[in-house]
Design a protein with these regions (language model features):
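A short glycine-rich, His/Asp/Glu-containing loop-to-beta-strand
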Residues: 1-23, 29
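Hydrophobic small-molecule pocket/channel-lining residues, especially in calycin-type beta-barrels
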Residues: 2, 19, 39-40, 66
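Conserved hydrophobic/aromatic beta-strand scaffold that supports enzyme active sites
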Residues: 10-14, 32, 48, 56-58
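Glycine- and acidic-residue-biased ligand/ion/polar-headgroup-sensing regions
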Residues: 17, 28-40, 45
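A generic "binding-loop/recognition-motif" signal
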Residues: 19, 28-29, 47, 63-64, ...
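Short beta-strand segments
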Residues: 21-23, 44-49
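Double-stranded beta-helix
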Residues: 66-126
Length: 126
């Protein structure tokens, strides 16, 4: 987590089966992902990457991307973010989602605070 560093945070992210982040971009933040379990598809810029255990991805600032868990089981990912703190975005997003359909203004505020410009919506596969 970001509690003891000024530059990077590292954390595990469990991506539910069928979850899709929706296309988004970070103006300042850079991200790395290392796939531990499961199978995901990343759309990074104009490329599609099928990520299986052992795949490492780097997403620089300003590059639109989305992540989709294409398997029937949760995927586990080790994620780093610089500057640190993006793990709190996921924590707060989960809190909003637990209340039912998130309030659009609360969601927009959350995204603004965590350098996330959402281009398409969060979703799950049907």
């Amino acid at each position: 987590t970001c509690e003891n560093t000024r530059y990077t945070s590292m954390f595990y992210w469990t991506i539910p089966a069928g979850f899709v982040t929706g296309r988004h971009v970070h103006r300042v933040q850079e991200e790395t992902f290392y796939i531990l379990d499961g199978e995901c598809e990343w759309h990074v810029g104009d490329k599609t990457i099928r990520a299986t255990p052992g795949t490492y991805l780097f997403i620089p600032p300003g590059v639109p991307h989305n992540i989709m868990n294409v398997s029937e089981k949760p995927a586990r990912v080790l994620m780093t973010v610089s500057p640190p703190g993006h793990e709190h975005y996921f924590e707060e997003l989960a809190e909003l989602a637990a209340q039912g359909s998130p309030d659009p203004e609360a969601l927009a505020d959350l995204r603004h605070r965590y350098d996330t410009d959402q281009i398409s919506t969060l979703t799950t596969r049907a």
